[in-house]
């Protein structure tokens, strides 16, 4: 079986890049002859070496998308299946299907709501992606893979996709990379931290909800004054706004790491006492899954796909959406109860092993491929 996987850009530190890298590696291990086509490849998906699709005239977004689609049409041939991810990859799959008759499967990760962005260009980008995907979903797709039940619901309700066309294949976790590590707490010396730690890993985009964690911090410090809050990841979008308007009283308890080497992330998960993920929208929730693989309890909001990944009262504590007081209460409860932290952490690890391995994701993806080709 020969499969062409298409995503226009493989971003560094992107959940979708992780998805493609982990999935293609395991599909290759199962005998699939797989190639990844991308216009730009900043992220690492080794051992797979992406095929960079080069073309001239890549200034305007529309020109880039059209050029990428046309060039892929000349390069993707003699494949049994084309598997696309995101926008504008979905158009490539439709084009190749029309041009060469190659069946097309599309994995839908979802788009963060327009209201979740403050940057006007990001709002326009999400509108463009959502509308484009809506029309593309009805113009030449054999199967759609949803990464969660929540995403399947979006596909049937808002994108009007026939339920019979949809298969759910959950994302996975690299269980060999993310697991409990002895001596990991030594990493806090680098940041001058000595005491309980609450960790967030991710971007600073508004919909990721860091502002709700910031609001929760004073409430936590009233009860657990020695707690440190580590914000690990990118600083794009609203960091300056957050720092000026909300951080003055709690600056002493905050540590911003910025982007980190990949090898440090598993140590951070293992070293923290509580992982907090206050995101206001998730199609799956990869970082909470990684934290649970490292046997750490999670505090998050009870909406979107998060309840599919974090079980309230068993592997973490889920608060009402946008309820910073509920977020604080969950963090405090875990910081004050070490037995609960250990129990939830171990249950989280077991659940990740049972339901969310990349090997299982690869097997289920292979089942979808076979259904299409039968």
What do these predicted regions represent?
Residues 84-90, 108:
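Short His-centered aromatic/hydrophobic patch
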Residues 280:
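Aromatic "clamp/platform" in nucleotide-sugar-dependent glycosyltransferases that forms part
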Residues 259-260, 267-272:
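Short alpha-helical donor nucleotide-sugar binding micro-motif in glycosyltransferases
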Residues 125-144:
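Membrane-proximal helix-turn-helix segments that form the acceptor-binding/catalytic region
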Residues 241-263:
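Nucleotide-activated donor-binding/catalytic signature segment of Leloir-type glycosyltransferases, i.e.
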Residues 312-313, 317-324, 333-339:
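Conserved acidic donor-binding segment of nucleotide-sugar-dependent glycosyltransferases
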Residues 40-42, 173, 201, 228-242, ...:
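Glycosyltransferase donor-sugar binding loop
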Residues 150, 172:
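Carbohydrate-associated surface elements
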């Amino acid at each position: 079986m020969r499969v062409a996987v298409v995503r226009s850009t493989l971003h560094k530190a992107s959940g979708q890049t992780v998805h493609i890298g982990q999935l293609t590696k395991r599909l290759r291990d199962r005998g699939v002859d797989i190639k990844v086509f991308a216009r730009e490849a900043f992220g690492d998906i080794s051992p797979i070496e992406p095929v960079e699709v080069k073309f001239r005239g890549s200034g305007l977004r529309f020109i880039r998308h059209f050029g990428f689609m046309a060039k892929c049409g000349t390069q993707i041939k003699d494949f049994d299946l084309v598997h696309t991810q995101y926008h504008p990859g979905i158009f490539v799959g439709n084009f190749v299907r029309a041009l060469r008759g190659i069946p097309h499967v599309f994995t839908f990760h979802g788009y963060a709501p327009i209201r979740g962005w403050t940057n006007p260009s990001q709002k326009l980008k999400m509108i463009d992606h959502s509308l484009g995907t809506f029309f593309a979903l009805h113009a030449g797709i054999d199967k759609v893979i949803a990464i969660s039940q929540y995403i399947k619901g979006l596909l049937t309700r808002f994108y009007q996709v026939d339920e019979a066309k949809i298969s759910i294949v959950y994302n996975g976790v690299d269980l060999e990379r993310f697991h409990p590590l002895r001596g990991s707490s030594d990493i806090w010396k680098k940041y001058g931290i000595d005491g309980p730690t609450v960790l967030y890993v991710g971007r600073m985009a508004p919909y990721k909800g860091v502002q709700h964690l910031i609001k929760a911090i004073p409430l936590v410090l009233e009860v657990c004054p020695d707690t440190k809050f580590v914000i690990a990841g990118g600083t794009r979008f609203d960091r300056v706004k957050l720092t000026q308007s909300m951080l003055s009283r709690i600056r002493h308890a905050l540590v911003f790491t910025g982007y980190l080497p990949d090898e440090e992330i598993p140590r951070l998960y293992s070293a923290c006492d509580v992982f907090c993920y206050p995101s206001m929208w998730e199609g799956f929730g990869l970082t909470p899954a990684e934290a649970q693989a490292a046997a750490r309890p999670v505090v998050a909001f009870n909406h979107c796909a998060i309840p599919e990944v974090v079980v309230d009262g068993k592997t973490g504590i889920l608060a009402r959406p946008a309820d910073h007081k509920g977020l604080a209460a969950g963090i405090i409860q875990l910081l004050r109860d070490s037995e609960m932290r250990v129990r939830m952490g171990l249950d989280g690890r077991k659940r990740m092993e049972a339901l969310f391995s990349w090997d299982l994701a690869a097997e289920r993806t292979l089942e979808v491929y076979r259904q299409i080709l039968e």
